[in-house]
Amino acid sequence: MFMFEKPYGMRDSLPGLYETKKKVRHSLTEVMNGWGYRLMETPTLEFYDTVGVQSAITDTQLFKLLDQNGQTLVLRPDMTGPIARVAASKLHEQAYPLRVGYAANVFRAQEREGGRPSEFEQVGIELIGDGSISADAEVIALVVFALKNAGLNSFKIAIGHVALAETLFVDVLGNTERANVLRRFLYEKNYVGYRQHVKQLPLSSIDKTRLLQLLELRGGREVTERAEEIVVSQEGKEVLAQLKSLWETLEDYGCTEYIRLDLSMVSHMSYYTGILFEVFADHVGSVIGSGGRYDQLLAHFNAPAPATGFGLRLDRLLEALDVKEINEPQEAVIFSKEQRLEAFAFAEKERSKGKKIVLQDLAGIENIDAMTKAFEQVTYFIGARKGEQNG
């Protein structure tokens, strides 16, 4: 029946799942706090003309509504835009760099056939005001330490750079319009289509080889050395130098076993300007997190500053962890009016020991057998008798 249905893409979190999410969320934010990132909240609703327009999420995926003054609002589609707004308006007088974190639900309209959630929780951080490679490395290393603290050990972080493929495409093809065709193949990870398209282009065999070799630039630090064979522009060489420096810093963090370079990586997030990365875990078909540098976003809020950060999908992380829902044992105290005072005192004493105690008046139970089966232990305070335990 309609009364039991939810809007498309929305999900319930029943008690067991809720407790599991709470535990995993804490394991992530614990590391974030330990690295000096202070958690904050922003409104669920934002103005479309500010956060909505600046979001990298496509307009068709935004949930829009009108307020009583006729202004268009959006349910926040991500957290980077809202935090950029706050940094520009409320935190701009604080000394940079700023380190802030969040754990919040975001909203994106989905096609009915896609089967994806329209509401999901992101846990992440933003490092604002530091444009160095060291800041990029800190953010990526924090992902590694946070995921390990959550209990995930089988994962990889693929790292790329926005400008590498772009400079190669423009250098070979001559303009961004032609480059956009190849970029779309990479974004969709349609490598077969990419190869077929390159082979049909009216280019020299040398230039075709350069474009095709881009797909092979995946692996460890040696990838940057192989890339020098196809990257000839000064901007491209500077990108490779950044990636080498990033790798060296991540080596010092002790993180490189979880890292691989993928120089063919592109992103649908239009605000990324430099290093970008995606997090993959075994047995999960989609990325469980992503991040990167977005040095131009805060300028749209009249507070230009470099920034980098990441967001992890809590639902996909739970899938990767493959953890059972938490159903902690509970005990019940069933009482009648005659021993209510004793029952209350007993329950408080047990709660002080860290136990979860449900107090239930006998008068409010319709089926005592069904009710008591849900509990690990039941203690009775009924009639004139003292407590009688039935475990």
UniProtKB/Swiss-Prot annotation:
Keywords: Amino-acid biosynthesis, Cytoplasm, Histidine biosynthesis. One of its GO terms (biological process) is L-histidine biosynthetic process. Gene3D superfamilies: 3.40.50.12590, Bira Bifunctional Protein, Domain 2. The keyword Amino-acid biosynthesis applies. Pathway: Amino-acid biosynthesis; L-histidine biosynthesis; L-histidine from 5-phospho-alpha-D-ribose 1-diphosphate: step 1/9. The keyword Lyase does not apply. PROSITE patterns: AA_TRNA_LIGASE_II (PS50862). Pfam families: HisZ-like, tRNA-synt_His. CDD domains: HisRS-like_core (cd00773). One of its GO terms (molecular function) is transferase activity. It comes from the Bacteria. It is found in: Cytoplasm. GO terms for cellular component: cytoplasm. Signal peptide: none annotated. Heteromultimer composed of HisG and HisZ subunits. Required for the first step of histidine biosynthesis. May allow the feedback regulation of ATP phosphoribosyltransferase activity by histidine. Belongs to the class-II aminoacyl-tRNA synthetase family. HisZ subfamily. This function is generally fulfilled by the C-terminal part of HisG, which is missing in some bacteria such as this one. This is ATP phosphoribosyltransferase regulatory subunit. It comes from Bacillus pumilus (strain SAFR-032). The lineage of its organism: Bacteria, Bacillati, Bacillota, Bacilli, Bacillales. The gene is hisZ.
